[in-house]
UniProtKB/Swiss-Prot annotation:
Claim: Transferase is one of the keywords in the record: no
Gene expressing this chain: aroC
This protein's UniProt keywords: Amino-acid biosynthesis, Aromatic amino acid biosynthesis, FAD, Flavoprotein, FMN, Lyase, NADP
One Pfam family, short name: Chorismate_synt
Function: This reaction introduces a second double bond into the aromatic ring system.
InterPro entries according to UniProt: Chorismate_synth (IPR000453), Chorismate_synth_AroC_sf (IPR035904), Chorismate_synthase_CS (IPR020541)
Subunit and partners: Homotetramer.
Protein's UniProt name: Chorismate synthase
Binding site for NADP(+): 48, 54
Pathway: Metabolic intermediate biosynthesis; chorismate biosynthesis; chorismate from D-erythrose 4-phosphate and phosphoenolpyruvate: step 7/7
Molecular function GO labels: chorismate synthase activity; FMN binding
Segment forming the signal sequence: none
Source species, domain of life: Bacteria
EC number per UniProt: 4.2.3.5
């Protein structure tokens, strides 16, 4: 499996499986002298971890992170940072019934075909449990971005099923289990979740991530454009089936006179491009949206096959999220932060002494 790393200057490599002993990651490229503690990382891990509300999987993992290397006396040393989280609440017996059966909509069939073997316990490496280490690495990136550049990366639930949430109050996002910024939608979201639980079904979601105060100039045309790397990173999150930058697919129905972000001496007049022009950050907020499919681990019977190719009807048992989009907010934030930090370090290496007379806002 060769796809376990992301980034060039800020490089994150993760390892571990859903029901293995532990999850871990190695982070290379972190500059020395950054104050960082396990408590700093834990803040974001607690936002992602399971079992924190009745709306998510009841697998109760504490997700306590341990810093194994790269930090001495509370600051980064510039060497590789090693992080680890132990798995403590596995119930592998829940998955014994699917040892020889391929769950429809999951990676069971493709992993078996590719590798000839698979860890069926909770999906193994294909499980979203792996994203805990992304969030841990992203917490370090977010702290560096905030301290050194004033960059703030935040996300929210933009839609779940037919319930759309307007960005009305950033503070509200951290005050409810849905990461919803619209108080008027909390009751409809609760009703939808109760309906799904009763039906044994699941639902999809849309998450929006915004990075503010991003410096001008990030991105490496042509193949490592900032939007291309963001799409790559966000698309790598489990269950993500679509990524939009700025207005995304809405541009299909727009005319050029509507979609272009006009500029005056006071700055940009709009941000349809999502803060990226020609693959390079413009200094405006970087905005991305992701669509997450409804989880296939549901109580509704479905058709599949076993290893012998025989038809099987199955119900997926175990502890699962009725909407994976709820806990995806901190994951999406982490992936955007990882990409931004990587590009900031790349920009500093090549163009750190470039000076332009063109105004910046």
């Amino acid at each position: 499996m060769a796809g376990n790393s992301i980034g060039q200057f800020f490089r994150v490599t993760t390892f571990g499986e859903s029901h293995g002993i532990a999850l871990g990651c190695i982070i290379d490229g972190v500059p020395p002298g950054i104050p960082i503690t396990e408590a700093d990382i834990q803040l974001d891990l607690d936002r992602r971890r399971p079992g924190t509300s009745r709306y998510t999987t009841q697998r109760r993992e504490l997700d306590q992170v341990r810093i194994l290397s790269g930090v001495f006396e509370g600051v980064t040393t510039g060497t590789s940072i090693g992080l680890m989280i132990e798995n403590t609440d596995q119930r592998s017996q829940d998955y014994s019934a699917i040892k020889d059966v391929f769950r429809p909509g999951h990676a069971d069939y493709t992993y078996e075909q590719k590798y000839g073997v698979r860890d069926y316990r909770g999906g193994g490496r294909s499980s979203a449990r792996e994203t805990a280490m992304r969030v841990a690495a992203g917490a370090i990136a977010k702290k560096y971005l905030a301290q050194k550049f004033g960059v703030q990366v935040r996300g929210y639930l933009a839609q779940m099923g037919d319930v759309s949430c307007d960005l009305l109050d950033w503070d509200l996002v951290e005050q409810n289990p849905f990461f919803c910024p619209d108080a008027s939608k909390l009751e409809p979201l609760d009703a939808l979740m109760r309906e799904l639980k009763k039906a044994g079904d699941s639902i999809g979601a849309k998450i929006t991530v915004v990075a503010e105060n991003v410096p001008v100039g990030l991105g490496e045309p042509v193949f490592d454009r900032l939007d291309a790397d963001l799409a790559h990173a966000l698309m790598s999150i489990n269950a993500v089936k679509g990524v939009e930058i700025g207005d995304g697919f809405a541009v299909v129905t727009k005319r050029g006179s509507e979609n272009r972000d006009e500029i005056t001496p006071q700055g940009f007049q709009s941000n349809h491009a999502g803060g990226i022009l020609g693959g390079i950050s413009s200094g405006q907020p970087v905005v991305a949206h992701i669509a997450l499919k409804p989880t296939s681990s549901i109580m509704v019977p479905g058709q599949t096959i076993n290893r012998q190719g025989e038809a099987v009807e199955m119900v997926t048992r175990g502890r699962h999220d009725p909407c994976v989009g709820i806990r995806a907010v901190p994951i999406a934030e982490a992936m955007m932060a990882i990409v931004l930090m990587d590009h900031l370090l790349r920009q500093r290496a090549q163009c750190g002494d470039v000076a332009s007379d063109v105004p910046r806002w």
